[in-house]
Amino acid sequence: MCMALQPEVSRWDVTPSEAVELQRRLREQLVLRPPPGLKVERIAGADISTEKGKDTGFGGFVVLDVETLAPVAQSEAVVTLHFPYVPGLLSFRELPTIAAAWERLTVRPDVVIFDGQGTAHPRRMGIACHGGLLFGVPSIGCAKSLLVGTHGPLGEARGSTAPLMHRGEVVGMAVRTRKGVQPVYVSPGHLMDLPTAVEWVLKVSPKYREPETTRHAHRLVNALRRADGEAAELE
């Protein structure tokens, strides 16, 4: 079993307006620098899959060895969703499912990469920030699309970066993980800074646009969703 959750940041029975206020309070708890002497041997991806029009979340973690990028552990959970889909409040809809999977992990990752935003968020409190606080682990947001901000020209070569600006502040980085392919948008979550977040995303994205952490977690939760649907058809 993985570690317990941080109770002060696991309030889900809130309205959207209450969630916004909670995000503002939680933002004050973020630490945007890695722990001193952080040694990363295991890095995880967290993801959730849902079916349109239904209120079930299929969540999972896959933990990879950082040297081989081979999976060493995984966990999954199926949870009923209670919070509506509201842009900017994704964590309140998705984290209860991801948290249930976290509690079933038998190997603690040193870093978690979320398929979503960290500080590149209207209130600087995306799912990677909330999740990092909840699990007490260094966390990174790596998103396929922008929620806020703009960036300047980005080179075509792998490893090219451009600061993501929002309201005069650098909130993340556009990162080219594969030559000639659309960038991903990287931002720190908790116990993380932007340069280190970019470094780790590039390290675990040797071939494809998305990090291997996200690719493995995405396959896991989609397989879980499909299996659930097939089981329902047999009933």
UniProtKB/Swiss-Prot annotation:
Gene Ontology molecular function terms on file: deoxyribonuclease V activity; magnesium ion binding; RNA endonuclease activity, producing 5'-phosphomonoesters; single-stranded RNA binding
EC number annotated for this UniProt entry: 3.1.21.7
Main location: cytoplasm
Cellular component terms per the entry's GO annotation: cytoplasm
UniProtKB keywords: Cytoplasm, DNA damage, DNA repair, Endonuclease, Hydrolase, Magnesium, Metal-binding, Nuclease
Site entry (Interaction with target DNA), positions: 85
Highest taxon in the source lineage: Bacteria
Record bears the keyword Cytoplasm: yes
Cofactor list: Mg(2+)
Compartment(s): Cytoplasm
Gene Ontology biological process: DNA repair
Membrane-crossing residue ranges in chain numbering: none
Binding residues for Mg(2+): 47, 115
Keyword Ribosomal protein (UniProt): no
Catalytic activity: Endonucleolytic cleavage at apurinic or apyrimidinic sites to products with a 5'-phosphate
HAMAP family registered for this protein in UniProt: Endonuclease_5
Known role: DNA repair enzyme involved in the repair of deaminated bases. Selectively cleaves double-stranded DNA at the second phosphodiester bond 3' to a deoxyinosine leaving behind the intact lesion on the nicked DNA.
Name of this chain's protein: Endonuclease V
Organism name: Myxococcus xanthus (strain DK1622)
